[in-house]
């Protein structure tokens, strides 16, 4: 938590973009720089990490990673450590991760700490938010929108997916658009990355 306030730190969200779309750690002004790899899945992480612009942002910095429960951080930090040993173009001040992931962070900081929005979960709960934070505040923090009407909305309900055959990640559909998304619009739903041609 303390490292997030340090300017020589870079924090990387190693989750998929559809997860970061509804919530993420937001370091304080003057603190750590936030990097989002904008991945559809974790198989895209090595390519992002090997990009020259990414290496430049990590060089000489403390690198903190986080994910939902800590497992993806373990893999991501091992990959970065391996890269450091193999080449001189990405030498950091150290690699760290949020132990126990966002789940534990939100239990440690029930008011949210530096967390904004919701934590996407892969179980029946669907999402998790800071226990002591008002629902209206959480809604304003997310910044995500319905993929149909673009109205602010932050819940993945109904298990809708991007219609792009190479993508198929979950998309957000608000209550008012759900019926159309299940019917006539089903083959036109796009995630934010596909909308931006990323």
Please report, for each region that a protein language model flagged, where it lies by residue.
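Rhodanese-like catalytic fold shared by cysteine-dependent sulfurtransferases
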Residues: 3-9, 16-64, 71-198
């Amino acid at each position: 938590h303390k490292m997030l306030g340090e300017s020589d730190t870079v924090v990387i969200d190693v989750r998929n973009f559809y997860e970061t779309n509804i919530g993420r750690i937001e370091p304080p002004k003057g603190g750590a720089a936030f990097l989002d790899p904008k991945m559809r899945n974790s198989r895209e992480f090595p390519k992002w990490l090997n990009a020259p612009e990414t290496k430049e942002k990590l060089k000489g910095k403390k690198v903190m990673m986080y994910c939902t429960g800590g497992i993806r951080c373990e893999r991501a930090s091992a990959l970065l450590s391996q890269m450091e040993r193999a080449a001189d173009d990405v030498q950091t001040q150290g690699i760290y991760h949020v132990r126990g992931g966002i789940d534990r962070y939100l239990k440690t900081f029930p008011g949210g700490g530096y967390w904004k929005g919701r934590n996407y979960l892969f179980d029946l709960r669907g999402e998790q938010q800071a226990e002591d934070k008002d629902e209206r505040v959480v809604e304003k923090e997310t910044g995500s929108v319905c993929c149909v009407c673009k109205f602010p909305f932050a819940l993945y309900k109904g298990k809708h997916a991007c219609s792009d055959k190479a993508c198929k990640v979950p998309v957000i559909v608000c209550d008012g658009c759900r019926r159309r998304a299940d019917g006539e619009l089903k083959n036109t739903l796009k995630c934010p990355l596909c909308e931006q041609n990323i």
